[in-house]
Amino acid sequence: MIIRHLSENIINQIAAGEVIERPANVVKELVENAIDAGATRIEIITANGGKNFIKVSDNGCGIPADQLTLAVSRHCTSKITDDVHNICFLGFRGEALPSIGSVAKLKLISRTKEAENAAEISVTAGKIVGPKPAAANLGTIVEVRDLFFVTPARLKFMKTDRAETNAISDMIKRIAIAFPHIRFSLSGLDRTSMELSATENNTQGQLQRITQIMGKEFAPNSIALDAERESVRLTGFACLPSFNRNNSLHQFAYVNGRPVRDKFLWGAIRGAYADVMTRDRYPVAILFIDLPPAEVDVNVHPAKADVRFRDPGLIRGLIVGAIREALQQSGIRPTSTRSEAMLAAFQTQKPLTQQSLGNFKNAHQSSSYSPQSHHFATASMVHKPLDSTNSFGLKENATPIMEGLNTPSGDAYIPSTIPSSEELSYPLGAARAQIHKNYIIAQTQDSLIIVDQHAAHERLVYEALKNALYAKPLPSQLLLIPEIVELSEEDATCLLTHKDALQKFGLGIEPFGPGAILVRETPSMLGKINVQALIKDLADEAAEYDTTNNLKAMLDYVAATMACHGSIRSGRLLRPEEMNRLLRQMEAIPNTSTCNHGRPTYIELKLADIERLFGRK
């Protein structure tokens, strides 16, 4: 076997396999070149998903006629000289055009403002023809035909025309978000599929461009980010936890204007939402990271989708801290999608018929009416005085907030008093009723609010546990009779590796034979809890955490699990004072729009929406 030099054309085809995987990659490379050329208008036309035809036109600075041959030659570029660590352009390798020309039919027409005429050059399967004079306006036009006709085997890996067109559209959207001052147009040979008008190149302009791409729901559900550490600045938008998706396609990250899809950045975003979102949902966020070029390596892969930071800890800390602070400062702010889903669930009821009223009439005629028989309580009922509670609704004597209260029996509580204007001015308003033993109905000056009492109190207890834990270990209470919990040997061994972490929460466990755990102490803050259920829930998740590397994650999960077991349960009736106290605590504590599992704690329905349901507006 003889070692020999590969031909330039074969080298370009190999390089094309790294840079050009599908038509969307061709569009990406050509659009990035247009942006680097200072274009303010970029038009893309495709046919058959870009497999047969791609045309990218721009009004950038153009390429001089005497440099066109260099432009389609490998490793020829005007964007860098000898400092590969100080890259300020999207493209810099000089590989895109020669790679495309080696596997397709490429035609490039360009004109600079100094030139009287444009010039044209063609590359077919690596063979260069031209340059020669042509007619064109200022800027560059690149046409690509019959992609991969040199390597037809690659076409077998292409998806349908629709799928490839969607990939091109997604690629343009991802780039367009970072450059709101550029007008983008995407069309087929017969119709325009996307038109993004230019906006101001500032925060407001970015939000307008994002709204063009993400839809009108984005703006009311997003929070602006602006944070800085050392030489790194983070801007962008993070959406409310309840405004989430079932995949990560709505997460966008840009490093010095370059769109990247980096798992490290996705992990940082995930970590920022860890306390407020379920694991099977994904936050919506758009991040712009600006830092000195020497602090980031964009030359990790030819596709330039991955980057490597010199100080990844600084970047992660900045992202997590900025998003969490923004979420905490957002206050009581329900997502618009909840109320819209709620409105969609309402239906105009069918007229009551004699048949539908039959059972009710029979029941009514067979018994006399009384408030108690219909499970209603009056505001004049005599109750025991409320026990003193701390700011989180947890009693100082470590009994849960609602334990031992003399609450009426029934399905609902409806107070007869009318709330004052001061009570209605609170963000979550004044409690007006409790229905189905779990939902608090509150009234504000211009809306109706429904609160899930268990989810809301779970978040309050969770925040209390975290604050208390990081201040000092939680006090525990000895069980009069220790409980033995039977687990599999694997689960028991895994949970016992977290014994010290659990002790910080006041949960004392020790081995008790193969697959068994003895529980001697429980957190006094939680009062009486179901020890068996708590230990089994902790064991189900403990295997995911390492005691050294992910201790904080483990502690947060333990706090969330304990909060779930120690909060107000569904089916517990509350008095007006208790309902209003819960509302005021929700207003005072951050992140109360969702519980620890990411479920919403309340839904707001505006009065205008209610009136619209009844045809009043």
Swiss-Prot record:
Q: Which Gene3D superfamilies match?
A: 3.30.230.10, Histidine kinase-like ATPase, C-terminal domain, MutL, C-terminal domain, dimerisation subdomain, MutL, C-terminal domain, regulatory subdomain
One GO-annotated biological process of the protein:
mismatch repair
Task: Give the GO cellular component terms, alphabetically.
Answer: mismatch repair complex
Cite the GO molecular-function annotations of the record: ATP binding; ATP hydrolysis activity; ATP-dependent DNA damage sensor activity; mismatched DNA binding
Provide the alphabetized UniProt keywords.
Answer: DNA damage, DNA repair
The answer to whether the entry has keyword DNA damage is yes
Q: Which residues form a coiled coil?
A: none
What InterPro entries has UniProt attached to this entry?
A: DNA_mismatch_repair_CS, DNA_mismatch_repair_MutL, DNA_mismatch_S5_2-like, HATPase_C_sf, MutL/Mlh/PMS, MutL/Mlh/Pms-like, MutL_C, MutL_C_dimsub
Task: Give the family from UniProt.
Answer: Belongs to the DNA mismatch repair MutL/HexB family.
Outline what the protein does: This protein is involved in the repair of mismatches in DNA. It is required for dam-dependent methyl-directed DNA mismatch repair. May act as a 'molecular matchmaker', a protein that promotes the formation of a stable complex between two or more DNA-binding proteins in an ATP-dependent manner without itself being part of a final effector complex.
Q: What is this protein called?
A: DNA mismatch repair protein MutL
> What organism is this sequence from?
Bartonella tribocorum (strain CIP 105476 / IBS 506)
